[in-house]
From Swiss-Prot:
Entry's Gene Ontology BP terms: translation
Superkingdom as given in the UniProt entry: Bacteria
Gene3D superfamilies from the UniProt entry: 3.30.1320.10
Database matches in Pfam families: Ribosomal_S16
Gene Ontology cellular component list: cytoplasm; small ribosomal subunit
Family: Belongs to the bacterial ribosomal protein bS16 family.
Keywords, ordered alphabetically: Ribonucleoprotein, Ribosomal protein
Gene: rpsP
Lineage, opening ranks: Bacteria, Bacillati, Bacillota, Clostridia, Peptostreptococcales
SUPFAM superfamilies found in the cross-reference section: Ribosomal protein S16
Molecular function via GO: structural constituent of ribosome
Protein name as it appears in the record: Small ribosomal subunit protein bS16
Length: 81
């Protein structure tokens, strides 16, 4: 089973809010997920990012592949170099 760490879009029309989730790569963007590990709010000033570092590191060690956007968020939080 290929596992990805990616963003799940939520929020109102034109006001996106994203949850950072671990999901099977075959499931739809806003579909089923295995575990929620944080959230990202690009609308608020300043942009709000909250990630559970322990869960993120656990999933990365288990082979989960982050998407490009999530990889950038992890770099900002110091989870990966």
């Amino acid at each position: 089973m290929a596992v990805k760490i990616r963003l799940k879009r939520m929020g109102a029309h034109k006001k996106p809010f994203y949850r950072i989730v671990v999901a099977d790569a075959r499931s739809p963007r806003d579909g089923r997920f295995i575990e929620e590990i944080g959230y990202y709010n690009p609308v608020s000033e300043p942009k709000e990012i909250k990630i559970n570092n322990e869960k993120a590191e656990k999933w990365l060690k288990n082979g989960a592949q982050p998407t490009d956007t999530v990889k950038d968020l992890f770099k900002k939080n110091g989870i990966i170099e």
